[in-house]
Amino acid sequence: MGSLAKKVLLTGGTGFIASHILTELLDAGYQVVVTVRTHDKGRQLLESLSNTGDKAASYVVVEDIAKDGAYDEAIQSISDLDLVVHTASPYHFNYTDPKTDFLDPAIKGTAGLLASIKAYAPTVKRVVLTSSSATIVTPPNHPEVYDETSYGSVTWEEAMVPQVTYRASKIFAERAAFDFIENDKPNFDLVTINPPLVFGPKPRHVTDLKALNTSNHIIRDTMLGKWKDGGAPIAIPFTWVDVRDVAFAHRQALELPEVSGQRFFTVAGHFSNKRIAEAIRATHPELADRLPPSDVPDDLPEGIYGFDNSKSRKVLGMTFRDLNTCVGDAVTSMLEQA
């Protein structure tokens, strides 16, 4: 498809992954309209881009993505929209009601966006959905190897269990998206990017480490010495990817005609608390006194499930960053605010 100054709507524009997708798309020459929940967030995001001199980004406000017709006004306000990247979906542990605070925004937000595009944006040819490895893995009954042909399963009742809610939200949202394509036959096709835990440099607009994205907490807390004497939470799901590689995958998914209707399991490797600490030790030796001793055993479980990322490599042309590079760059970005 190519960029050629095409216009992209990027939902959840201030999120961790979305912020890096925004940079990737702007660098490739796209015009990008991001959705934010408030004007303050939109202005803050644009101000963070001001030092790059980039004028190809703008924003629209969508306050509550779970509301009926939440995206209608935003979609109608954008002329000649070509492509959509949907990242907006909860990923945090600060919620009280699984349905209202987590499941509805993920599921209704996705289905509602697709309905709005069909109704008001006939020029859109493709939607790329930021899904998750949560839609691929099925704990605790893991096969030896996961790939894009694997589908996670969960019931609505199980989704009410806090430890399952996030995984369920991604499974139901992805399912709703593909069901919409099959049943409503819109003017656009769908591609999903399914990363595991996403690490990497913090977004430019984040100036407080307390506001850091949830997935980077393990790096932040290790860097700050929180786990020097042990006690770090189990490093589930034990697989990771660099956010910059995820951003590249989204751009490729927008541009390659042959990926229509496909899922991509964008996983770089396995990680553990031990491996995170050793990556910090290798890239920032000045922080060694904050880290657990180097002789602490690796906490990656024996016999952990494998993964096959060959489709992402071959079709999307991905070359994944290694853990030391990812963690080292993340720490460097965090030290600017620490």
UniProtKB/Swiss-Prot annotation:
Origin: domain of life: Eukaryota
Enzyme class per UniProt: oxidoreductase
GO MF annotation terms: oxidoreductase activity, acting on the CH-OH group of donors, NAD or NADP as acceptor
EC number, as in UniProt: 1.-.-.-
Keywords: NADP, Oxidoreductase
Residues reported in the UniProt entry to bind NADP(+): K41, Y166
InterPro entries: Epimerase_deHydtase, NAD(P)-bd_dom_sf, NAD(P)_dehydrat-like
Chain's role: Ketoreductase; part of the gene cluster that mediates the biosynthesis of azaphilones, a class of fungal metabolites characterized by a highly oxygenated pyrano-quinone bicyclic core and exhibiting a broad range of bioactivities. In the first step, the non-reducing polyketide synthase azaA forms the hexaketide precursor from successive condensations of five malonyl-CoA units, presumably with a simple acetyl-CoA starter unit. The reactive polyketide chain then undergoes a PT-mediated C2-C7 cyclization to afford the aromatic ring and is eventually released as an aldehyde through the R-domain.
Family: Belongs to the NAD(P)-dependent epimerase/dehydratase family. Dihydroflavonol-4-reductase subfamily.
Protein name, entry field: Ketoreductase azaE
Gene that encodes it: azaE
